[in-house]
């Protein structure tokens, strides 16, 4: 099977929401909230939602946000979140390709680093991210849920 990686466009909202149900089905946004957030994301040049599309089906996605910065010679940094692959399409390299493209976008944006957060603690997921070039030794993440 072959797939393509592209930035999500206005018409991809329903596909993204469907994919996100595999991340957090319990807190899906209302249609109004989703539409408002989608409009804000689409108008922000620093926010990239990448899609992995296989045979016309949006099978995987991740979000990359480039953050302007006043340290590190004013070079921005980037965050990757919401990495998800439809269960029927796992193990085909989609997520690896998405992460590779996200890192390329960060590099093209002049970022000095890209960070990735995951809520998964299982070895398979953590080893997947390590295999994609990320490490868990350089930084310690803390989260305060609001």
State what each model feature region is:
Residues 51, 57-66, 79, 84:
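Conserved beta-strand in the GNAT
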Residues 1-11:
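Conserved N-terminal entry element of GNAT/NAT acetyltransferase domains
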Residues 106-118:
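Conserved GNAT acetyl-CoA-binding A-motif
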Residues 69-80, 90:
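A conserved beta-turn-beta hairpin within the catalytic core of GNAT-like acetyltransferases
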Residues 91-104, 131:
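Conserved acetyl-CoA-binding loop-helix of GNAT-fold acetyltransferases
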Residues 96, 108, 120-138:
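Conserved active-site alpha-helix within GNAT-family acetyltransferase domains
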Residues 17-39:
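Conserved GNAT-fold acetyl-CoA-binding loop/helix
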Residues 39-51, 79:
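A short helix-loop-beta-strand connector motif used in the catalytic cores of GNAT acetyltransferases and
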């Amino acid at each position: 099977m072959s797939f393509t990686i592209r930035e999500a466009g206005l018409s991809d909202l329903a596909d993204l929401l469907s994919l996100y149900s595999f991340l957090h089905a319990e807190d899906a946004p209302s249609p109004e909230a989703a539409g408002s957030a989608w409009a804000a994301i689409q108008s922000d040049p620093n926010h990239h939602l990448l899609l992995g599309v296989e045979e016309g089906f949006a099978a995987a996605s991740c979000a990359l946000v480039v953050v302007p910065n006043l340290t590190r010679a004013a070079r921005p940094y980037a965050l990757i979140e919401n990495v998800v692959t439809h269960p029927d399409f796992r193990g085909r390299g989609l997520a690896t390709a998405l992460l590779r493209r996200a890192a390329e976008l960060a590099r093209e944006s002049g970022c000095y680093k890209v960070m990735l957060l995951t809520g998964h603690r299982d070895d398979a997921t953590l080893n997947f991210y390590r295999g994609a070039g990320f490490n868990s030794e350089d930084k310690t993440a803390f989260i305060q849920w609001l």
